[in-house]
């Protein structure tokens, strides 16, 4: 019933309350670009753990966490540039929308850092939980639900919207276009992004120390 109701209302007014169909399509586009540019760091680390390569990599003097994040960004940035050059001009021509490109790029970088740090934590957790596919599945679903990819956040109950916008999943997919188009406070989003990056970095460093300690104990 809901899809047909939405279609009927959109056909007459183009809006449902504060919901803008054009913006919703842009949110899905940017979210999908961010998702497709993800290197799937969790799966790569999981393979390292299962093959034992992680032991060799941990012996490298380079910080494991920073090396993984730098490598992920090295893949993400060129991929994002290619996708953006191909798709954004086409969609902008068909569905023009006002947004700040510099702000979009800044929060895209923040989103990439948060997304890769989450993937890093999931991958490293496989050192302690051999079958952690369930964790990855749940996080992936939360990322899509709170990242504006399933149901537009604006159509959710207000209390769910408030919760969604405080999560790292929102910051990883939906925040860049929301902030760039002025639908969410840039100052608030930047603060959230910095806090999440620092928190996730701390968790990754703590988990890395636990892995090293376990390796020493087990020889």
Predicted regions mapped to residue ranges:
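Hydrophobic alpha-helical transmembrane bundles that constitute the permease/transmembrane domains
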Residues: 1, 33-37, 69-85, 113-117, ...
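Secretory targeting signals
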Residues: 77-106
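Junction motif at the cytosolic side of a transmembrane helix
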Residues: 9, 180, 188-219
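Transmembrane helix segments
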Residues: 127-179
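Hydrophobic alpha-helical transmembrane segments of multi-pass membrane transport proteins
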Residues: 22-83
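Hydrophobic alpha-helical transmembrane segments
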Residues: 22-26, 81, 101-109, 138, ...
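A structural motif at transmembrane helix-loop-helix junctions in multipass membrane proteins
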Residues: 105-144, 150-151, 213-216
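Transmembrane helix-boundary elements of multi-pass transport/secretion proteins
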Residues: 1-36
